[in-house]
Amino acid sequence: MTIWEISEKADYIAQRHRRLQDQWHIYCNSLVQGITLSKARLHHAMSCAPDKELCFVLFEHFRIYVTLADGFNSHTIEYYVETKDGEDKQRIAQAQLSIDGMIDGKVNIRDREQVLEHYLEKIAGVYDSLYTAIENNVPVNLSQLVKGQSPAA
């Protein structure tokens, strides 16, 4: 392979990598705007916004993380939950980000309402488990949130 062939491939790799990173940033912006501009009371608070992941505090007790999976050219978005004190961060869902700006092949990352709805579908099990625990006056176990199980009454 000549230096020019390698140069051409390197340019292609860099361009595609930049494009994927741009799509990730657009998704993050749409999700943050969707949450902050929503009239619904989701009890989400923005906690941190580093380059790699988003973090929201839920009910002042749980953290929800949204991040691109590790690895070069990863198209997998991962959703995690942990307690606010940092107990055992666990994945609750995944989605796929395409190079053309779609999530799971159906959600346009530029549409903040669609992005928010998709995100809420991914974390709905957390809300369901918390609701059931509160309704039945029982404590919440993080592993139950991850599995989407209702705490025992």
UniProtKB/Swiss-Prot annotation:
Annotated organism of origin: Escherichia coli (strain K12)
Entry-linked NCBIfam families: PRK10198.1
Physiological role: Regulatory protein for the formate hydrogenlyase system. Could act by directly interacting with FhlA or by preventing the binding of FhlA to the upstream activatory sequence. Also down-regulates expression of the hyf operon.
Pfam families: HycA_repressor
Gene from which the chain derives: hycA
Disruption phenotype: Increased expression of the hyf operon.
Keyword hit for Transcription regulation: yes
Disulfide bridges in this chain: none
Keywords (A to Z) from UniProt: Transcription, Transcription regulation
Protein name: Formate hydrogenlyase regulatory protein HycA
